[in-house]
Amino acid sequence: MIKVSRKTNETDISVELNLYGMGKASIDTGVPFLDHMLDQVARHGLMDLTIKCDGDIQIDDHHSVEDIGITLGQAFVQAVGDKKGLIRYGYSYVPLDESLSRVVLDLSGRPSLKLNVSFTRAMIGTFDVDLISEFFQGFVNHALVTLHIDNLKGINSHHQAETIFKAFGRALRVAITEDERQEGIPSTKGSL
C-alpha cells in the first residue's frame, strides 16, 4: 500500500493505493461526480484506492480535480517502481449504451496526454467537463506515463466520461500485470 499526501494553499489530499487489490474504493473528494469516476477506476482496475480531499470548492472544483490527478500520479509512480517484469502497455475499449471509448497507455517514463473527446454538454450536473483533461494531465505529469484517450462515439456526456474512466482503469490493470516471461525492464534501453 502506497500512501501519498499533498497539501497546498488550495487543497489537502491523501491517497492510499494498492495496485494489486480487489477494486475496493473509499473516495471523498468533495466533487461527487469525480468520486463516481474514481470509483470506476478502482473497480475496473482492481486496485484498492482511498482518496480524501479538502479543497477550495467554494471557488470551483478546478484545484481539487487537478491536484487529485497529481497526487494519484505520485502514488502510481511509486507503486510501479522500476517496472521490472511488467507488461508496460495497456489498452481497453469500454462501451456504455451509445458511448464507446478507447484508452491506451505506456508506462514509458515520458509524460504525454492526447485527449480526443467532444463532450456533447459542457456540464455533467454541476461538474465542468473541462476538468477531465485537468485530472488526466495532472496524473500523466506525475505518473510519467503516455496516455491516449479517445471517445469514439457518444451522445450522453455522462456516458462519455464514464467509458473513459472505466477504460482508464482497465488499461492500467493490463499495463501493471506481471509478465512471467519478462525478467527485466520492458525496454531495449534497459530503463524507463
Swiss-Prot record:
This is Imidazoleglycerol-phosphate dehydratase. It catalyses: D-erythro-1-(imidazol-4-yl)glycerol 3-phosphate = 3-(imidazol-4-yl)-2-oxopropyl phosphate + H2O. The keyword Nucleotide-binding does not apply. It is found in: Cytoplasm. It comes from Vesicomyosocius okutanii subsp. Calyptogena okutanii (strain HA). Keywords: Amino-acid biosynthesis, Cytoplasm, Histidine biosynthesis, Lyase. NCBIfam families: PRK00951.1-1, PRK00951.2-1, PRK00951.2-4. GO terms for cellular component: cytoplasm.
